[in-house]
Each structure stands twice: as C-alpha cells, then as structure tokens.
Swiss-Prot record:
Stated role: Stabilizer of the mucous gel overlying the gastrointestinal mucosa that provides a physical barrier against various noxious agents.
PROSITE patterns hit by this protein: P_TREFOIL_1 (PS00025), P_TREFOIL_2 (PS51448)
Cysteine-cysteine disulfides: 28-54, 38-53, 48-65
Subcellular location: Secreted
One GO CC term on file: extracellular space
Signal peptide (residue range): 1-21
An example molecular function term from Gene Ontology annotations: growth factor activity
Gene3D superfamilies membership: Spasmolytic Protein, domain 1
InterPro entries assigned: P_trefoil_chordata (IPR017994), P_trefoil_CS (IPR017957), P_trefoil_dom (IPR000519), P_trefoil_dom_sf (IPR044913)
Protein name stated in the entry: Trefoil factor 1
Domain of life from the UniProt record: Eukaryota
Protein species of origin: Rattus norvegicus
Keyword rRNA-binding among UniProt keywords: no
Modified residues (Pyrrolidone carboxylic acid): 22
Amino acid sequence: MEHKVTCVLAMVLMLALSSLAQNQEETCAVIPRERINCGFPGVTAQQCKEKGCCFDDSVRGFPWCFRPLVIENQQEEECPF
C-alpha cells in the first residue's frame, strides 16, 4: 500500500512539474566541434545573446557565438502498480 501511495505522489509531482516545462529545453553545453555558428566575426557576447545564441570565447578555432543545443524532454514512464 505504501508503495502505491509513493507512486501516486511521484506521478502528481511529475505532472505538476511537467506542466511548467516545455517539450524542449535548450542548453549552451555544446561540444566545441558540434557548435553551429550563429554570429559574425567580431560579434560581442551581448550581440550574440540578443540573437538567442550562446557565447563562449574560451576555445580557439571554433565558433564563439553558436546555437544552443535543443534537448527533447523524455516521455515519463508509467508507474507500475
């Protein structure tokens, strides 16, 4: 019985949190060789962010202004009870 209650509470919490989240998330944690250029030579961090892109000038030879990585939210697993 206690397991069922825990499962139900977990489901309610997941549903509440999922209503706040979208189907996709974006992150700037992109491997340098996988960056897709989003700027132009000499772009500033502010100009880059205004375009909705990520800025990281710590790695030479790769785009500093690049598109964020889109992560698809995984579907929730059903609670077996």
